[in-house]
Amino acid sequence: AEEPRSDGPGRPSPPGPDDMAALIYTSGTTGNPKGVMLSHRNLVTNAQAVQQIFDVEPADKLLSVLPLAHTYECTIGFLVPLLSGASVTYLDGPPTPSRLLPVLERVRPTIMLSVPLIIEKIYRARVVPKLAKLPGFLRKFPPTRTLFHRLAAGKLKKTFGGRLRVFGIGGAPLGPDAERFLRDGKFPYTIG
C-alpha cells in the first residue's frame, strides 16, 4: 500500500482525482466476483454520466435493497441521490417479503434498483400462478394476456407504494417473460 500524501505533520493531503476511492465488486456474472479499484475520478465521472440520462430530483425517495459494494447500487443508488439531494432508505437485510413489504408501505419509493432475480421471483410467485388459471386460449391470446399483465402490474405498483416512477434493473439479463410482463403492464422499469 502507498503512504498517504501529507500537507505537513499529522495532516494528510486531500485525495487526488486518480487516488483510489472505493473497492467495488463485480457481480460475478461470468465467473467469481472480483474487486475493482475505482478512483475518485471514476466515481464522479460515472455519477455525472448517470445524471445526464437518469433524472433524480431532491423530492425523490430511493429504497436500496442491493449491496453498496456493487457498482450499480453504489453509483445509481448512493452517489447520484447524494449529488441530487434525494433521500435513500436502506433495507437492513436481504429483501425478503417480510422485511421488504412494510418498508415499501412506509417509504413509498419513487426510485428503486434491483437485480433481475427479484422481479423474476415476484413474477413467478404472484403473476404466473394466476395467469395459469386462465383457460389456455385466453392465456395465449395477446390482448387478454396484455390486459391481465396491466391489471397485475397495477397491483404491483401499489405494493411498491404507488409512487414508483423508475424501477431500475441491472447486473444480469432479465428473462423475456418477466420483461414482457413489465412492458405489457406499463410498469415504470428501465434496464441498465
Residues covered by each model-derived region:
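Short aromatic/basic micro-patch
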Residues: 14, 37, 113
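Conserved AMP-binding/adenylation subdomain of ANL enzymes
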Residues: 44-61, 68-153, 163, 184-185
